[in-house]
Amino acid sequence: IVGVNTKTDVVSGKVLSVSQDSVEIEGYGSVKLDEDFIMYEKENSLISNYSSIIVGYALQDFIVADGEVCGAIKNKPLQADNIRVIIKTSGFRDIFFNEAVFCADSGMIVETGEESYETAPGETVVFNPDTEDFNEGRIKLIPKSGEIQFQSVNRGIGTPSYGGTIEVSLYDEGIVVVNEVGIEDYLKKVVPSEMPSGFNLEALKCQAVCARSYAYTE
């Protein structure tokens, strides 16, 4: 060791997305990852890379220097209560939408940056690449009660609806929609979509276990 540089700027918050090049942190935005980024896990003294960052949780403190995240310290254990699921287009062909249309029978709270507004019950909200709300970054939709219908998608059961919250983001390729929901509520939706409810109860239980295990792994 010929020298030590102390880096004291720390950013903490729920991770909304991560890639090889950047990490998006709630309340802070997207920050570039240093090419030599490493993460130290205090619980088991492991050193890992960006692929070990868990999206949807605030488990680590990110060390920032010169506008880039150069490292992170994971100091909290994972207690997986929620799951974040990217919603695909009709036919599950793509993750990018040209337009995203939502509606909630109870109305919604729409959060854009530091601002928010409410929609009336049954009111439709439309997002496209020209929507000015995207200037504030990621948009969050919260139903006042019940679920939110995603009218831009058609499934075998018709127009799908989602509990929890919906996040809408604009990328160069199009609009990406993410549903954050409790694990158990997610399983209530995914298991019936994977096998008929008329199947034997034990078979349904096995499918629920498989779906839960897959969700935790992902």
Where are these regions (language model features)?
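Conserved, single-site charged/polar hotspot
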Residues: 1-218
